[in-house]
Amino acid sequence: MSHNTFGHLFRVTTFGESHGPAIGCVVDGCPPLIPIDEADIQTFLDLRRPGTSRFTTQRQEADRVRILSGVFTDEASGKQVSTGTPIALLIENTDQRSKDYDAIKNLYRPGHADFAYDAKYGLRDHRGGGRSSARETATRVAAGAIARKVVADVTIRGALVQMGPHKINRDAWDWDETTRNPFFCPDAKAAAFFETYLDDIRKAGSSIGAVIEIVAENVPAGWGAPLYGKLDADLASGLMSINAVKGVEIGEGFDAAALSGEANADEMRIGSLGEPVFLSNHAGGILGGISTGQPLVMRFAVKPTSSILQPRHTIDRSGHESEIVTKGRHDPCVGIRAVPVGEAMVACVLADHFLRHRGQIGEGAVWPANRSR
């Protein structure tokens, strides 16, 4: 299996399966002398960790990360810092229940990657989906914690803004609220509704989808490159690579198709300090594949968890029709834990584009340098 690596200068390779002994990643391209310790990474892993509420899978994984390489204690500061060499991170699996999947070993689970993997490789790991499991995303969160250090001036935050057909009230948006409820929801009233709503879905043995919004602030103008290195293209690719994601939009996204040209274009003025000021942000902070200095705004849609307790029609590996009920421990709304995963992927893409921009352009801002020409 190829394509287990993403990024150009900041490169992440992940490895491991859902029911294997461990999962992990190797981060290559991290600059030297960046303070990194396991506690920094663990903070973000704990946000994604399973079994933290009744609304996520009850698989109990501590997700304790170990740094195996790429760091050294700096004698001058006494801190553990990156050396510039590959950083290997390992997370052990401790709560696998492979026997839960014995009954469906030869059955394809509808909505899962079972059939597609078998069609391509001639085999599949039926134990929790193996490599196709969302368990792999813990390694992305670990890599994202390092990426955040590379772009330390950038603030990256995510929120669940829709569950099923129910959207939050954007006028009630409060980022602090995302830390007060199990849904990473910025609307307190919506979070209270989601609690009852998802309880009913969970008790019925079903699942539901969600929409996640990620906002990255303090990204300077100039990151990204035309035509085939566009920042929004790489962000979309990173977010689409997350398990169960079926759609990504930047800024107004698909709603832009319903707007007129004058409504969609972000008009500009000169601010009090001579800086460019945008009067709106329909573009989501990216024009021509290059950041504008405005907040980057993106959303991705997560489909309902395919593993449910409702019986469904399927076929087996021998070509016989059958019925399947997927047992085991699964998220009733996988979109909840996709929030820190989405943040991590955005962080990795931004770290990569920061290094690519610095390598081509240098540290200086381009726009002010061009004003006198």
UniProtKB/Swiss-Prot annotation:
GO CC annotations on file: cytosol
Enzyme nomenclature, EC number: 4.2.3.5
Matches recorded under CDD domains: Chorismate_synthase (cd07304)
Pfam families: Chorismate_synt (PF01264)
Superkingdom assignment: Bacteria
Protein's GO biological process: amino acid biosynthetic process; aromatic amino acid family biosynthetic process; chorismate biosynthetic process
Lineage summary: Bacteria, Pseudomonadati, Pseudomonadota, Alphaproteobacteria, Hyphomicrobiales
Family: Belongs to the chorismate synthase family.
Keyword tags: Amino-acid biosynthesis, Aromatic amino acid biosynthesis, FAD, Flavoprotein, FMN, Lyase, NADP
Protein name: Chorismate synthase
GO molecular function term, any single one: chorismate synthase activity
Pathway(s) where this gene product acts: Metabolic intermediate biosynthesis; chorismate biosynthesis; chorismate from D-erythrose 4-phosphate and phosphoenolpyruvate: step 7/7
Parts forming coiled coils: none
Task of the protein: This reaction introduces a second double bond into the aromatic ring system.
UniProt organism field: Beijerinckia indica subsp. indica (strain ATCC 9039 / DSM 1715 / NCIMB 8712)
Cofactor(s) named in the record: FMNH2
Co-factor binding comment: Reduced FMN (FMNH(2)).
Binding site for NADP(+): 48, 54
